[in-house]
Amino acid sequence: MNNKNIMIVGAGFSGVVIARQLAEQGYTVKIIDRRDHIGGNSYDTRDPQTDVMVHVYGPHIFHTDNETVWNYVNQYAEMMPYVNRVKATVNGQVFSLPINLHTINQFFAKTCSPDEARALISEKGDSSIVEPQTFEEQALRFIGKELYEAFFKGYTIKQWGMEPSELPASILKRLPVRFNYDDNYFNHKFQGMPKLGYTRMIEAIADHENISIELQREFLPEEREDYAHVFYSGPLDAFYSYQYGRLGYRTLDFEKFTYQGDYQGCAVMNYCSIDVPYTRITEHKYFSPWESHEGSVCYKEYSRACGENDIPYYPIRQMGEMALLEKYLSLAESEKNITFVGRLGTYRYLDMDVTIAEALKTADEFLSSVANQEEMPVFTVPVR
């Protein structure tokens, strides 16, 4: 390949990781992003009033079982130990999530052992539901009406804007209960937070002489001719000017407020009742427990359907969306010299570790395709 110029659209984890891998192999990489900052939705910044590090687009906690990815991020940031312990306000009480032995004993006013709790939950479950088809049936089958209505029903309606009876059972993976006192929200081997924030980490990944970044810059289709390859991490439907219509997303609204002292005593407090309009309140200084701040910055988080001018967060991927997605995939699969990557480019919800793993794989695949004089695929991951 004589032309070693690469264009990357989007300066989130997908874009900068691919850029770094290719820059180290001698490619000249230009990253563009329509926003006025790098980092995508992982962007964080200091609040000028309190000096608290704020996760601008909502909380991002790094958790993975992938040692390669963990070692990768540790090259670019000092990762501090961090365990996500989520609380939930339900019926005037505060409980620990995920539902664990403490939650069960508190909720049912009992002192069950693990085996007794297992028997209790089994008894509460609706065994008449043999093959759960919906989120609601899955919850009723595994945890019963009381826990479902207290912790899942209202929260799910607020989060997805749909009744749990309309959502697929697959959203509620397996039995969402622990029969011990473990209240670590994640099960992953490696968990942490970058000491200086995600923005600094992403800046460090992008800090290479062969990488240039242009912000507040839209991608122009005619630019493709100037580059050997384009990696596009923007919305797939936007690339085609929404010609078949818009793929459905949920978006988030954040109501920011400051407080002197501690507002809620934890990083994340879920509000499970349908009567409370927000899904949760996050208190950002608790995401950096190694720091000390007198003031506090909190976000009330609201979920709703994503409009034309909103930031897309969660791909809906229901039946109608999947039919529309298929039309865009058919268009994309006829392209050459472009690869769609990341959450928006592949219309999939991705945690940060998966995003990084896929970006590393995509860069390797590109280098291999060049070495073997093969065509680089438009998608490097399953998207259907």
Swiss-Prot record:
Q: Outline what the protein does.
A: Catalyzes the interconversion through a 2-keto intermediate of uridine diphosphogalactopyranose (UDP-GalP) into uridine diphosphogalactofuranose (UDP-GalF).
Xref: Pfam families: GLF (PF03275), NAD_binding_8 (PF13450)
- Binding, UDP-alpha-D-galactose: 84, 151, 156, 160, 185, 270, 280, 314, 349
Organism the protein comes from: Klebsiella pneumoniae
Catalyzed reaction equations: UDP-alpha-D-galactose = UDP-alpha-D-galactofuranose
What GO terms in the biological process aspect are recorded for it? Answer: O antigen biosynthetic process
Q: Entry cofactor note text?
A: Binds 1 FAD per subunit.
Q: Where does FAD bind?
A: 14, 33-34, 41, 60-61, 219, 343, 350-355
The superkingdom of the source organism is Bacteria
**Residue ranges crossing the lipid bilayer per the database entry:** none
- Using the UniProt record, name the top-level EC class of this enzyme in a single word: isomerase
EC number of the protein: 5.4.99.9
Which residues, if any, are the signal sequence?
Answer: 1-19
Which pathway does it operate in?
Bacterial outer membrane biogenesis; LPS O-antigen biosynthesis
Q: Give the multimer and partner information.
A: Homodimer.
Q: Which UniProt keywords apply?
A: FAD, Flavoprotein, Isomerase, Lipopolysaccharide biosynthesis, Signal
Q: Name one GO cellular component term.
A: cytosol
Q: Which residues form a coiled coil?
A: none
Name of this chain's protein: Probable UDP-galactopyranose mutase
Which protein family is named in the record?
Belongs to the UDP-galactopyranose/dTDP-fucopyranose mutase family.
Q: Which cofactor does it need?
A: FAD
SUPFAM superfamilies from the xrefs?
A: FAD-linked reductases, C-terminal domain, Nucleotide-binding domain
Q: Which Gene3D superfamilies match?
A: NAD(P)-binding Rossmann-like Domain
Q: Which GO terms describe its molecular function?
A: flavin adenine dinucleotide binding; UDP-galactopyranose mutase activity
